[in-house]
Amino acid sequence: MSQATKRKHVVKEVLGEHIVPSDQQQIVRVLRTPGNNLHEVETAQGQRFLVSMPSKYRKNIWIKRGDFLIVDPIEEGEKVKAEISFVLCKDHVRSLQKEGFWPEAFSEVAEKHNNNRNRQTQPELPAEPQLSGEESSSEDDSDLFVNTNRRQYRESEEESEEEEAA
């Protein structure tokens, strides 16, 4: 199986199905990623340990700090105590909350996590006085997309007058 085909099936599996954790599985939150496909997680009871990412998810699914996972316990591990079995997206979290499988300790964290992802990052620009006629329609750029990853340079009237005089 080629890498592209494998990626397609893994992504389809993660995004498509809604899974319910079994008795042995746990829902955990990612705290940090120390590397080597290991992730430090915290359970709803506050217990911290390392989990490993199976090879089918490596280079196909990316896990960030604050994401939620379903993990299977590993009995022979000292430091690594579980393996990731499913990565939960916000739709999965909502369905687990509706079905009553979501831990109460993660309820507030999940709400904050969803709100931060949905929040718009565009800063509001100060409103400029409206001009009449054609000038206002040609110079009104407030409905255009603003790239927040770039610096915004503002020209003062003095600079523009100096450029026109030269």
Swiss-Prot record:
The modification Phosphoserine is found at S132, S136, S137, S138, S156, S160. The keyword Chloroplast does not apply. The modification Phosphothreonine is found at T33. It comes from the Eukaryota. InterPro entries: EIF1AD, NA-bd_OB-fold, RNA-binding_domain_S1_IF1, TIF_eIF-1A. GO terms for molecular function: RNA binding; translation initiation factor activity. A motif (Nuclear localization signal) lies at residues 6-12, 56-65. Residues 156-166 have a biased composition (Acidic residues). It is found in: Nucleus. It holds the Pfam family eIF-1a. CDD domains: S1_eIF1AD_like. Keywords: Nucleus, Phosphoprotein, RNA-binding. The keyword Amino-acid biosynthesis does not apply. GO terms for cellular component: cytosol; nucleoplasm. Residues 5-89 form the S1-like domain. Residues 114-166 are annotated as: Disordered. Plays a role into cellular response to oxidative stress. Decreases cell proliferation. Belongs to the EIF1AD family. Interacts with GAPDH and STAT1. This is Probable RNA-binding protein EIF1AD.
